[in-house]
Amino acid sequence: MIRFEIHGDNLTITDAIRNYIEDKVGKLERYFTNVPNVNAHVKVKTYANSSTKIEVTIPLNDVTLRAEERNDDLYAGIDLITNKLERQVRKYKTRVNRKKRKESEHEPFPATPETPPETAVDHDKDDEIEIIRSKQFSLKPMDSEEAVLQMDLLGHDFFIFNDRETDGTSIVYRRKDGKYGLIETVEN
């Protein structure tokens, strides 16, 4: 069952808004054979020009679904967010099922969270390095193809994971030419 944590910035979340979000985003449950118990984090922000920004993050077992949308109409933005999330689920489910068929295993679509790393470095006038954001997360075992899929779903340029084949920490990244690279760590 998907539980919702809905927060509003410069906007009071009314029952009508809450119900609309829960009804629309809650329809994603139909894509799961076993509906996971997860919290969907929804943030709705309004701006001075009356436009709204909706962000939805749903951390599942093997993938994190995330989408954001800016729109002048809050309800239209929620509809667009739902469409984006549905495309992500279908894309992920198709790849997982295709891979499972190749491995002669058939498992229902799995589900769970993984938060990507976000560490930013800023150089000030004295050339001192200041870390302005730090995150911690557990590395999930997966292969490089799953890591690339996770990176694409999150919209990031790199993704750190525990490589199932080598049992080491690896990084996949998007190259400037649009292809992907893999960095594997070795123990000395």
From Swiss-Prot:
Keywords of the record, alphabetical order, are: Cytoplasm, Translation regulation
**Record-level GO BP terms:** negative regulation of translational elongation
The UniProt entry's sequence similarity note says: Belongs to the HPF/YfiA ribosome-associated protein family. Long HPF subfamily.
One GO molecular-function annotation for this sequence?
ribosomal small subunit binding
Q: Looking at the record's lineage, which domain of life comes first?
A: Bacteria
What is this protein called in UniProt?
Answer: Ribosome hibernation promotion factor
One Pfam family matching this protein: Ribosom_S30AE_C
Subcellular location as annotated: Cytoplasm
